[in-house]
């Protein structure tokens, strides 16, 4: 794999990132948004001490509702750091953590990530490496990380590809998510291996964020995982969605036309490159208890028994501010 002709993700932009920026608007340097001790991940990742998370800027998806929109918008630069600077910052925080190191939105910085891991190992540091991805991955990219990544933490956002195109500019999302998670399973299996303190050291946790008004999409995701992957996987079923202060999100809202839907939601017509699709005005609200309960019901009926659920009011607790040294205020 190379950044001279970057094809790390399904965008396959083939850009020479030593001379120009790719679809993600990133070059070949190490750009960092934040390196922080984070206590808000799933219990086997955060434990009581927290996980050291390195947040990369930009993203190979562009979800209109992104909760981390301050750093995920294409072209958001973060801070350019040297390899030594990044590793020094990580090394300072690791003794305070559960010895877990998470890379958040790493796909477009995969080669830089590998360099960081190798440099840390050369210094005698061997944290558990957590690959925190949106799931829009090439299986061959995931395959290249065998022996580097210990715990895979993919999102599985969509079963509805029309929805994926309209909300995230990723019309073929579900096939790539399925294939990439299958490769993760080949590497580490379906069992989440933990140490004697319950801290994850090897395995997979799949995250799914329930979107208000799109329960069918969430149930479809669970069905895809159960039927095509395994119901034995650990699922983190999140209810923490909230309407972001993303200027693009607010602008888009002002451009929508409103009608009444069968469910009582006003409909919003979104025009994009390939299709027209109507969405409920529900994206401007949080997930209701009724919606989340319906998804939980499918979780159990499809055979899942392992994972984590959130309180439906969890959206009040997840409000990162990446203008601060610690975006999570802890």
Q: Positions of the model-derived regions?
A:
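Conserved AdoMet/S-adenosylmethionine-binding subsite of the radical SAM
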Residues: 88-249
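Short Fe-S-cluster ligation motifs
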Residues: 32-53, 88-105, 296, 307-309
